């Protein structure tokens, strides 16, 4: 009961208005009335005023304000690169379109019209889906803050995606690529070899320090990633909790890493840079390396050959293709790549596995 009789004969109203977003404590009021009838009327009046005030606040929230609320929470709860990505998508594709919109009047129709607008600009289905996801998250914030009762993006289907043919290098192609790199470019030989033989993500590789190499167990301790944001080198946790893992390496790869470490120490001595176990493995100057130089060099080293260049991330695909060719199972590959589930591994790489039907048919041939 929200109304109870006190010992002095009066009636107390106990009305709750939810929880304080800062302290987490319940927001409540307990006024007193002379009679039960007055108490019930007071309770109804307080609840009505609360609903009217909440509705007034909802109507006063503009779309730019809603964006600010979403980005503020995103900056606190997300990794820096994700926050920057959301900020970019919203500023480039969303904010101007809904600038003067009354968020209380945005319906499913307005959302699908916006999606149609995006498609007409020539964006790929994947890009449109990403933008729509960001828009939906903005409205999720409105629902969470009780500005809206429901998300107008609900039940808007994602556009179908056409799976592009995955590009990767086979071992003989990778060997040819490595042979194209001059002998004095040991940094690049080492970087691309580590990428091909471990399948690490680029951010994970650039965040590696010498202390992350276990020479006894022949393992790399992968527990961080990195990126450059607004000119600052930012180290973060890996993509998912499953990305924190230990990746086994072969002896030849360890020897290559040790050769590069010696060369790096000599380079640092010449430049007057301190070298230690905290030094980033693929660093070659007084600041950690950026991804773009390793991306550009792939095309540069391939330019005078008939070898088709691949993207930096395709080294990860190449590693998986190598493991599948060697007969490794999904579970092993999932753990090595740091995927959150086997389903992810199958969805991304399942088509690379050999067709078992052909193998079965060949066995039946042998019976006749």
Swiss-Prot record:
Domain Core-binding (CB): 61-143
Alphabetized SUPFAM superfamilies for the sequence: DNA breaking-rejoining enzymes (SSF56349)
Positions of the Tyr recombinase domain: 164-362
UniProtKB keywords: DNA integration, DNA recombination, DNA-binding, Viral genome integration, Virus entry into host cell
Active-site residues annotated for this sequence: 201, 239, 313, 316, 339, 349
One of the record's GO molecular function terms: site-specific recombinase activity
GO terms classed as biological process: chromosome segregation; DNA recombination; establishment of integrated proviral latency; symbiont entry into host cell; viral genome integration into host DNA
Signal sequence coordinates: none
Keyword DNA-binding on entry: yes
Family named by the database record: Belongs to the 'phage' integrase family.
Cited function: Putative integrase that is involved in the insertion of the integrative and conjugative element ICEBs1. Required for the excision of ICEBs1 from the donor cell genome and subsequent integration in the recipient cell genome. Appears not to be transferred through the mating pore. Integration of ICEBs1 involves an attachment site in the chromosome, attB, and a site in the circular form of ICEBs1, attICEBs1.
UniProt name for this protein: ICEBs1 integrase
Species name: Bacillus subtilis (strain 168)
Gene that specifies this protein: int
């Amino acid at each position: 009961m929200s109304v109870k009789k006190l010992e002095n004969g009066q009636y107390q109203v106990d009305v709750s208005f939810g929880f304080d977003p800062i302290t987490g404590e319940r927001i409540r009021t307990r006024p007193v009335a002379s009679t039960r009838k007055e108490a019930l009327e007071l309770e109804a009046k307080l609840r009505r005023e609360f609903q009217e005030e909440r509705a007034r606040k909802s109507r006063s929230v503009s779309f730019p304000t809603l964006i600010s609320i979403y980005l503020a929470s995103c900056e606190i709860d997300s990794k820096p690169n994700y926050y920057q990505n959301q900020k970019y998508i919203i500023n480039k594709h969303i904010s101007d379109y809904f600038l003067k919109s009354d968020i209380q009047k945005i319906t499913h129709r307005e959302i699908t019209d916006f999606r149609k607008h995006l498609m007409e600009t020539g964006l790929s289905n994947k890009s449109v889906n990403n933008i729509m996801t960001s828009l939906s998250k903005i409205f999720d914030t409105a629902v969470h803050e009780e500005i809206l009762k429901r998300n107008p993006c609900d039940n808007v289907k994602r556009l179908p995606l056409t799976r592009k043919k995955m590009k990767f290098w086979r071992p003989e192609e990778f060997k040819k690529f490595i042979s194209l790199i001059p002998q004095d470019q040991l940094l690049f030989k080492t970087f691309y070899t580590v990428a091909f033989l471990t399948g690490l993500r680029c951010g994970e590789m650039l965040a590696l320090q010498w202390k992350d190499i276990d020479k006894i167990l022949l393992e790399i301790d992968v527990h961080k990633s990195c990126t450059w944001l607004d000119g600052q080198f930012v180290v973060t946790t890996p993509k998912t909790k499953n990305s924190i893992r230990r990746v086994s390496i072969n002896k030849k790869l360890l020897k290559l890493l040790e050769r590069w470490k010696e060369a790096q120490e000599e380079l640092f001595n010449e430049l007057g840079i301190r070298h230690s176990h905290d030094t980033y493995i693929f660093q070659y100057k007084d600041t950690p390396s950026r991804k773009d130089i390793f991306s550009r060099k792939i095309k540069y080293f391939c330019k005078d050959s008939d070898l088709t260049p691949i993207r930096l991330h395709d080294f990860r695909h190449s590693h998986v293709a190598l493991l599948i060719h060697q007969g490794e199972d999904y579970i092993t590959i999932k753990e090595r790549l740091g995927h959150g589930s086997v389903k992810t591994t199958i969805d991304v790489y399942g088509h690379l596995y050999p067709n078992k039907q052909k193998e079965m048919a060949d066995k039946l041939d042998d019976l006749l």
